[in-house]
């Protein structure tokens, strides 16, 4: 009994220590959560300077480092295309890779504004061509979003990745959806996968069909995009059938789109077309009319050659007329 009585105070002290540690941990967690909520409130209200002050004071993040910094004069000069001011700021020692609270760099701003000279100056000063914002946006994405082929080419020359993982916003899909076929041309020339499938978007061809961007659809198909790959079980023809463009539907059919393909609802493209529309009539007519032997042969030969070797078609010992036919020229 005496041993138990002596050990009891120690057990109580030990439990008190654990309780104190737990209390301190909970208090610290509460303070951090409160500060995070407060910072978010200031950000939403547009007071990023106050958010930066909180971060610097409580998290030990220096505002000079730029991680939580507001837009710098360099950001402003880049976004407005003021080249002379940009060069002056760089000569004064401003960080070329300074980021805002959203991790936007001056290069992001220059590309978003299609300011090629500013973008070149930043890249020559050491700007990161693959900088990523908190939303996963790169300078190349901004360039393709604005249709700036010059900025896109410049970024790629300075090491920008033409294609990132599927979890990041895709410059290819952005260019295809907005009809910026010149940017798409450049990306294709730099070796992108024209069939890159992003789960919530589908392939670039599917996106282009949804947005009715004929020139981008043509560029993708000419580059060898798979006419059957869309979004999940929906093919590009499913997407085009829901739109009014007969030109796009005819183009897809010419490149071998399967008129009998079914999506997850077991619906064919013709089932999705507006009743009594021109698109529905074309699909029904194509369904009832067999493809010509020339068309079937062209599709068969192209499939056999493969997308990676389309550029070798001119080397085949064939008449120029047949070469052009195989290349849809």
Curated annotation (Swiss-Prot):
ANK repeat boundaries on the chain: 69-98, 102-131, 135-164, 167-196, 200-229, 232-261
Pathway(s) annotated for this protein in UniProt: Protein modification; protein ubiquitination
InterPro entries: Ankyrin-SOCS_box_domain, Ankyrin_rpt, Ankyrin_rpt-contain_sf, ASB5_SOCS, SOCS_box, SOCS_box-like_dom_sf
Any one of the GO BP annotations: protein ubiquitination
Keyword Glycoprotein in record: no
Domain SOCS box: 278-329
Segments forming a coiled coil: none
Gene3D superfamilies: Ankyrin repeat-containing domain, SOCS box
CDD domains on file: SOCS_ASB5
Protein keywords: ANK repeat, Repeat, Ubl conjugation pathway
Domain of life: Eukaryota
Pfam families: Ank (PF00023), Ank_2 (PF12796), SOCS_box (PF07525)
Biological role: May be a substrate-recognition component of a SCF-like ECS (Elongin-Cullin-SOCS-box protein) E3 ubiquitin-protein ligase complex which mediates the ubiquitination and subsequent proteasomal degradation of target proteins. May play a role in the initiation of arteriogenesis.
Family: Belongs to the ankyrin SOCS box (ASB) family.
Domain notes: The SOCS box domain mediates the interaction with the Elongin BC complex, an adapter module in different E3 ubiquitin-protein ligase complexes.
Name of this chain's protein: Ankyrin repeat and SOCS box protein 5
UniProt organism field: Mus musculus
